[in-house]
């Protein structure tokens, strides 16, 4: 580890009050805790977020689908960096930050020797499925099964919306099959987890795997992943695993609060704004744990209330028709990725397809947006009430920050008073010395006689 990197990590962990916007995240965590092997300090919640985030990396042609020795995280990170440098291909979501993270992982005694096995990546437009998963052999007697969240593909986003009216989407079905396959291939206790849709898949797999596999799952991590329909969270299967599900959301969560949850949330402080708090790099860490808050923001509650009210008013058949109609319009661009939709030629294709939409589908889409608007308006009174309450009673971290500022002001006053007293004593001593010297000079002639 470079001294500059260590210094940066130390500054963030010890708290640089001059730069309150700089707080430690998963990068700093790797720099700060990376010298502690998992055998010495067992896997923690922050490790689980990091491994879940790494499932977004494009391991294609780097990690195989077999459950043999696999490839070390150090070697995988090196290859990812080489391919990115050579071909300018994307990594996970933020190339600049991802490169820093991968470089730190390569030097980390905690992570570099973790083995990657069983990598699968599947995008099927016909089945409207986007699914990817990888298993990490931790080297301390357990395996971490990580499910990837939504990627940049249009079909991946479509599958997310399908969750609002489907009892089971293809990725959830494959998550169950994958977890059971891991259990047969590896004779180790299991931890399953994921970020965003990956967290939903992890929870779903924990619910619906066979009894033998479920018995080996120690913990299920859901990092800001959406919930389920009411039938699923009321099911017997959910009750068999709910005590092992650990759900984490940022204070202004808008993704993790979607659909219905029955398990409690752990609220993590994020320095992101609004929906950008979904980015794992914005989650704040102190030492070996997240900085936790006691309450979500009014914006998060407003989004939660709005979406739930909208789903209750918009029946499943209408949801399907509206979502299928919008997807058909977007698919007219022939763009595979969401970013492709913003290219000029593709935008024109989308607009043309929207104009050609049949009357029934157009009515369903317009009704969906009308109900969404009315749901938002219906949630305004509650939002205003929560906002007023949050102004009257600040969140704990804000209170701590203001207390720290108050303490700093008091300390500054004490120091100023102490300096003033010291200065006054110094002036007094100087005055006394000068008076003594003057008196000595006056007496000098008399002594000479």
Give, region by region, the residue ranges found by the protein language model.
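Alpha/beta hydrolase fold serine-hydrolase catalytic domain that processes acyl esters and thioesters
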Residues: 2-3, 10-46, 51-65, 70-133, ...
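Intrinsic low-complexity repeat tracts in disordered regions, enriched in small/polar residues
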Residues: 414, 432-433
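Gly/Ala-rich beta-loop-alpha elbow adjacent to hydrolase catalytic centers
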Residues: 193-198, 202
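Short glycine-enriched nucleophile-adjacent loop
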Residues: 202-211
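Acidic, Ala/Val/Gly-enriched low-complexity intrinsically disordered segments
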Residues: 418, 436-437
């Amino acid at each position: 580890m470079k001294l500059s990197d260590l210094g940066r990590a130390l500054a963030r962990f010890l708290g640089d009050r001059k730069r309150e916007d700089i707080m430690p995240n998963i990068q700093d965590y790797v720099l700060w805790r990376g010298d502690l092997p998992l055998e010495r300090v067992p896997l923690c919640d922050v490790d689980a977020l990091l491994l879940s985030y790494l499932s977004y990396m494009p391991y294609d042609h780097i990690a195989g689908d077999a459950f043999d020795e696999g490839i070390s995280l150090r070697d995988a990170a090196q290859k990812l960096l080489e391919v990115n440098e050579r071909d300018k291909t994307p990594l996970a979501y933020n190339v600049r930050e991802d490169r820093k993270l991968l470089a730190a992982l390569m030097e980390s005694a905690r992570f570099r020797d973790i083995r990657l096995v069983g990598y699968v990546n599947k995008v099927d437009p016909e089945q409207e499925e986007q699914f990817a998963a990888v298993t990490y052999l931790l080297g301390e007697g357990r395996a971490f099964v990580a499910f990837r969240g939504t990627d940049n593909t249009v079909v991946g986003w479509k599958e997310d919306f399908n969750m609002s009216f489907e009892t089971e989407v293809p990725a959830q079905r494959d998550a169950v099959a994958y977890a059971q396959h891991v259990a047969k291939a590896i004779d180790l206790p299991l931890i399953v987890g994921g970020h965003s849709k990956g967290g939903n898949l992890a929870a779903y797999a924990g619910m619906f795997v066979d009894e033998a596999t479920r018995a080996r799952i120690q913990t299920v991590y859901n990092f800001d992943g959406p919930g389920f329909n009411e039938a699923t969270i009321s099911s017997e299967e959910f009750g068999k695993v709910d005590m092992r599900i650990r759900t984490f959301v940022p204070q202004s969560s808008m993704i993790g609060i979607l659909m219905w949850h029955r398990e409690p949330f752990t609220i993590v402080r994020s320095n992101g704004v609004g929906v950008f708090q979904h980015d794992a790099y914005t989650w704040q860490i102190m030492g070996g744990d997240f900085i936790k808050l006691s309450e979500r923001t009014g914006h998060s509650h407003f989004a939660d209330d709005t979406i739930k009210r909208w789903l209750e008013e918009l029946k499943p058949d209408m949801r399907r028709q509206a979502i299928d109609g919008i997807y058909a319009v977007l698919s007219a661009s022939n763009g595979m990725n969401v970013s492709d939709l913003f290219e000029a030629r593709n935008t024109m294709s989308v607009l043309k397809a929207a104009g050609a939409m049949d009357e029934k589908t157009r009515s369903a889409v317009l009704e969906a947006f009308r109900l969404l608007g009315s749901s938002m308006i219906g949630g305004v009174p509650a939002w205003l009430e929560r906002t007023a309450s949050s102004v009257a009673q600040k969140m704990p971290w804000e209170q701590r920050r203001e207390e720290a500022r108050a303490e700093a002001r008091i300390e500054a006053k004490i120091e100023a008073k102490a300096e003033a007293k010291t200065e006054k004593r110094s002036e007094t001593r100087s005055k006394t010395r000068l008076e003594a010297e003057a008196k000595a000079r006056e007496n000098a002639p008399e002594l000479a006689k």
